[in-house]
UniProtKB/Swiss-Prot annotation:
Protein name: Mediator of RNA polymerase II transcription subunit 17
Gene3D superfamilies, A to Z: 6.10.250.2620
Entry keyword set: Activator, Coiled coil, Nucleus, Transcription, Transcription regulation
Summary of the function given for this chain in its UniProt record: Component of the Mediator complex, a coactivator involved in the regulated transcription of nearly all RNA polymerase II-dependent genes. Mediator functions as a bridge to convey information from gene-specific regulatory proteins to the basal RNA polymerase II transcription machinery. Mediator is recruited to promoters by direct interactions with regulatory proteins and serves as a scaffold for the assembly of a functional preinitiation complex with RNA polymerase II and the general transcription factors.
Keyword Zinc: no
Subunit structure: Component of the Mediator complex.
Length: 641
């Protein structure tokens, strides 16, 4: 069987996967047949018959050709020859096209060298320089005089039109340039005015062509430090526009209120900038700076309050609250300066002053924290570590609370000692006490290595101490009370330390640390009671002259801690004296006793063992009528019958 090789010369007709759209088919029919008016049934039938006859003719020719049995080698040779001819024709066409392209490119290089060079071949670039070929008209046909005149008139018109257009463009450009110069002059003059007033003007980090003003604090928390840079935009007329970015449009300020027994009795004054015109560029910069500072202040207050929950500090929605005493508390919130601050009918001058002082204090402490950040940044950094360094909370609430609590305890102790010693003076017992508030604050020895302001603030960040020195009635007896408040390191809060010097009761020593007012009051009155009992037993005071010749009774202390003394007369009669001391009064009661009851302790009336006193005397600090002194009363009851 002989091998046959057939090579189809027609392109294969593939079935389309999708039908042509109707508009496409209509376009094809129009391109093939022309207008639909020229197409009728007879024309179409004739065309169909013509196509059928053509197919039959081609099939017959192919059938006859296929019947010829050619040798396989000859067919392959013919195929290779045909392919070589086709390739040669294609290469020749390509070369002719490239020659034509080089010719056109070289011709155009006379007028547009850069554009023409991109389409030239490398060989042509080497052998022919750019612009070496040009074209011109040779023996142009003569033109009539009318055509020449028309050409000159047209060219003159085009030149005049071009000159007018150029003049209009120049005038418009000059006007626009004048406007731009005026705008730029105004813009740069306002920028220089901002710089001359001390503000830092620099380029924006992400916009190299824009200027910005640095009104924030470089040592602030990163989220507020990055917001402290605003762009200085130029308006259409050249005015300066401050693009504040994330800073709110309205001003904000931290408000401090003092609430006493559930009623707001004091409020700080809203902080306002000293600039008269708030709409000026400086006024807007100051407003943005102050608002950013107030937001950072409240942010740090809330951040510090979250770690002070165990010390009575609570936070709410836009509110920080802490108690100073049982009746007094302080509230801090971030509000609009135009909001109503407090009811004037309930305002107390003292609490208003306290609120203003607290508002100034927390702002000063935040500025001090910024300075500490700057000082820390200028020092050598600590060793590198994989652990993330914790940013400590600023000392804003803790020093403020320490001062308020310490002031409250100092005022209470001073008032208590004043009342007790007033009672003693009313009883004729000469004694006094000396108060030294804030003894730990030594302004004379401020650290000189730092600025004065920082050294002054540093004094109030230390634990606060106040001392009270009191003399007792008996000579060489005294006691000291030291009030110490610390909210930075444990133990937190206010503690009282009492030191006692009482030679006649050497075993009596107070606790090392007391934290309650009631305990302090009890200890102080107890020491004074012991000293009064000792004074009576030793007969201190002025002797009382008596007309009768009687021997005064000698008092013996039986229960010193309960203020009880016993006296036995020469005839065997016995008397008991009970001394009671409180903040408001000093009372002395005399009782007649018999037998073994003399050495038993007196108890309250509810016990059923305390008889009615035979004599008694009470002294108060605000007594309207004069009374005999304590020693005079003791001398009068010490007469034996």
């Amino acid at each position: 069987m002989s091998d046959q090789f057939t090579l189809p010369l027609r392109p294969l007709i593939e079935e389309r996967d999708h039908q042509d759209l109707l508009p496409v088919e209509i376009a094809q029919i129009s391109a093939q047949w022309g207008s639909f008016r020229d197409v009728n049934e007879e024309t179409l039938r004739a065309k169909i018959e013509e196509e059928k006859n053509k197919e039959y003719t081609i099939d017959d020719e192919e059938g006859e050709g296929a019947s010829v049995d050619l040798d396989t080698t000859e067919r392959l040779d013919q195929l290779y020859k045909k392919r070589a001819e086709i390739t040669q024709f294609a290469m020749q066409a390509h070369m002719e096209a490239m020659f034509a392209l080089d010719f056109i490119s070289l011709l155009l290089s006379k007028y547009t060298p850069r554009q023409a060079e991109t389409s030239m071949s490398a060989f042509l670039k080497q052998v022919a320089p750019l612009g070496s070929l040009t074209a011109e008209l040779v023996n142009p046909p003569p033109k009539s005089e009318a055509a020449v005149r028309d050409a000159k008139a047209v060219s003159r018109g085009w030149r005049l039109q071009s000159f007018n257009a150029a003049a209009d463009k120049l005038l418009k450009s000059a006007a626009r340039l004048e406007t731009e110069v005026a705008s730029e002059t105004r813009y740069w003059s306002e920028v220089l005015a901002v710089k001359d007033k001390g503000w830092k003007v620099c380029r924006l980090p992400r916009e190299g062509q824009a200027l910005g003003v640095q009104y924030g604090f470089l040592e602030a928390t990163p989220i507020f430090r990055d917001r402290g840079l605003a762009a200085l935009r130029r308006s259409e007329d050249g005015g300066l526009i401050l693009d504040k970015g994330l800073v709110p449009a309205k001003a904000k300020t931290v408000r401090v209120r003092v609430k006493n027994r559930g009623v707001v009795t004091g409020c700080s004054k809203p902080y306002r900038s000293a600039v008269q015109d708030s709409e000026s560029i400086e006024g807007r910069i100051l407003q943005a700076r102050d608002t950013l500072y107030e937001e950072e202040l409240f942010y740090e207050l809330v951040r510090e309050a979250r770690i002070m929950g165990s010390q009575g500090v609570s936070t709410g929605q836009n509110l920080v609250q802490f108690s100073v005493s049982e009746d007094e508390e302080v509230l801090l919130d971030l509000v609009d300066p135009d909001v109503a601050y407090a009811d004037d009918s309930e305002t107390s001058l003292e609490h208003t002053v306290v609120a203003d002082a607290l508002a100034h204090s927390i702002r000063i402490l935040l500025s001090y924290a910024h300075r500490q950040n700057r000082r820390r940044r200028t020092q050598p950094p600590p060793p590198l570590t994989q652990k993330r360094r914790h940013v400590p909370e600023y000392l804003l609430l803790r020093p403020t609370m320490a001062y308020l609590q310490h002031s409250f305890h100092v005022r209470w102790l001073e008032s208590f000692l004043g009342d007790v010693y007033g009672v003693l003076r009313a009883a004729g017992l000469e004694s006094k006490f000396t108060a030294t508030p804030y003894a730990s604050v030594d302004l004379a020895h401020i650290d000189r290595s730092v600025p004065t302001v920082e050294g002054l603030v540093k004094q109030f960040l230390l634990p606060l101490e106040s001392t009270f020195s009191a003399d007792l009635i008996t000579p060489q007896t005294s006691f000291n009370v030291k009030t110490r408040t610390n909210l930075l390191v444990p133990p937190f809060g206010t503690h009282f330390e009492i030191a006692l010097n009482m030679p006649h009761y050497p075993d009596v020593q107070p606790p090392s640390r007391i934290g309650q007012h009631d305990q302090v009051a009890m200890m102080v009155t107890h020491f004074l009671l012991l000293d009064i009992v000792s004074t009576i037993s030793h007969g201190q005071g002025q002797p009382v002259k008596s007309e009768t010749k009687t021997t005064p009774l000698s008092w013996e202390v039986t229960y010193p801690h309960h203020g009880e003394l016993l006296a036995v007369a020469s005839d065997g009669r016995q008397k008991k004296m009970k001394v009671q001391l409180s903040r408001s009064e000093l009372s002395v009661q005399m009782f007649e006793t018999h037998g073994t009851d003399s050495y038993s302790r007196l108890v309250g009336a509810e016990g059923g063992m305390l008889p009615l006193p035979s004599q008694s005397q009470t002294w108060t600090a605000d007594a309207a009528t004069p009374h005999p002194s304590l020693m005079e009363f003791v001398a009068s009851v010490s007469k034996s019958a």
